[in-house]
Amino acid sequence: MGATACGKQADTEENDTSYVAAYFALPDAVTGISRLLIKDDTAYLCCIEENGASYLASMAADGGDFQKQPIEVDDSVSLLDFAFDSTGNIWTICTDHAGSYRLNKFDESGRAVQSVALTEILEPSAISGAVRNLFLSIDAEGNICIAEKSGSTSAYLFDSSGQFLFSLHNEGNLLTTITTAEGQIGVCVGRMDYNLLTVDMKSRDWNKDTINLGTTAGLYGGTDSNFYRFDSSSLYRYSAGVQEGKHVFNWSDVGLGTSDIHLGELSDGRLMVLAASPDQTGTFSYEMAVLSQGEDERTVLSMVSLSAGPGVVQAVSDFNKTNSKYKVELTEYFPFEQNVSDEEWNNAVINLNTRIISGDMPDILDMSDLSVQVHHKKGLLEDLYPYMEKDPDIHMDDYFENVFQAISIDGKLPYITDGAGISTMLADADIISGSTGWTLPNLEEVLNTYGADSISNLSGAFFLKVMLRADDSFVDWTSGKCSFDSPAFIKLLELAGEIQNNSQNSASEELSDTYAAAYQAVLSIYHITQYRDYYHGNLEVLGLPGGNGGYHALIPEVKIGISSASQKKEGAWEFVRTLLSEEHQKSCTMLPIHKGAFETVMQAAIDGKSTWKWLYEKGKATKEDAELTKMLLSSADYVANGNQILENLVLAEAQEYFSGASSAQEAAEKMQNRVTLYINEQM
């Protein structure tokens, strides 16, 4: 057990409210949780183990006394979800190996008292053989709702005796179901933005009054508050009858995991949060945290991100959980899950740049969505090489040093990453037989020979974006000049137009038999395994087409820098250095840049225990795949530098060319003018 103070939040519901967390580990055997509910100030969990065994368990509010509940269930039956009715009975959704589904009722002692067959009630599944994604909630009157997530949402309503009444449908994608503190069943549906629907049992229809939740990554019933919403960045509480939630705390401030989150409210207002920490080498590791009001006297380190990815939030959470001297307060303009318009994004960038110009610099900057080149040129970022050299626990030989060299600008290291993907192209080796390199003319030859739609995962617009990020020859941030009207770029634009006009595939589609080559961001060994099988062992890694042959570009998982204006650089480095630890890098999503962590992650994949296994379930990663993945990571000497505003300017004019509204020359000249103006504004 551990306890860490988690400090005061800006703009919270109560400005003086702070939270402290006490942490309790769950048994290692638990690898999945489908539901957490609070009853009589005890947490009840629907647990799944790696071998497929499932059961209900309870856990006291002090984190102790984890116990399996003695309900009468055959070993062949899997529990999918559960709920309590007002008299204390337990209702569960179950399935068996034969693929039948049942709604089962147990009394408080765990004795089975009723079973309702669901197979004939549920609509036929669109995916044969797959376990159906079913959720269960019960209202204050005992009415039961079973909702299914299957692209759209189907809800099946039963009375308190288990008698089926009616069904409802909604085109939105189901996130979850809850029971609010008012005793209503809530069905959370939507796409990028979610709504909370409730059921009018009398009219047998959805209630007309819905709550627009906006960005939602999790929804949980409350006790004092009606319900809680997690948006991937912060927690909000909703009182009964209101449309707007009140901010409770930033998730990373309280040191909580960011995967598979469950939450319940105790009668005294404390919160029980169950969350998993990611780890590429195995299954989820769960931890329970009990949050209560308290004081935090640690030194605050400010950090700003336009939209912090899960890896950034998890890194901040881990630091805030374990560091006794410093606490990082992460401010985000947008939650990672939020759908943001170009106008909103541009305004946020302008706002942040205005703050920086006025001297309002945070201690730590998430550079993932900011222009590293611009901030470096203005001297706003610390060179992190001296920090690494002075740190007794960091040795350059432990890392793929080329990653730091690729990131470096003018010999200085503007940020740190923990993992990286590789932007590259792959092909059947036979299609480039006899070629001495991989250049734009080579790519054009492949397109002419095999067709402009013969490259998987590549539209013309996406090809242009990839090349803009990986090839910095068109923008010189040192001189403030660009060359989008050059013959080289016009040729690139024409090639993109050829791909765009003929492409019938996108990055979201699966491989078919028609692709001679493919673009791929290699984030895992399983990408290599998949293409090795696709090309029947005759895989050739081409790289991106360049003037001097193919090259591979790094895609940093995170980009964390220290402000040169910070008065707490020592503390800021305390946080940034955690990204380099071997233990941390086992949990990053992409390929670890620490050699020891990389080897551990590769071996886990070879043993079939990687969390990336879902990417290519029928494939088996081999030592040869690991060696090829290592070669890619260790040989990449460029870094993909994204600049969304600049990309939008270029792609807007490119679309004019793709549609035939302008020539390549005209589009390039417009790009040159617009990008030149943008660069001048940044200098």
PLM-predicted stretches and their roles:
Residues 107-109, 113-115, 388, 405-506, ...:
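Helix-loop-helix "hinge/cap" segment bordering the ligand-binding cleft or interdomain interface
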Residues 494-574:
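Extracytoplasmic/periplasmic substrate-binding proteins
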Residues 245-246, 253-259, 264-265, 278-281, ...:
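Mature extracytoplasmic/periplasmic domains
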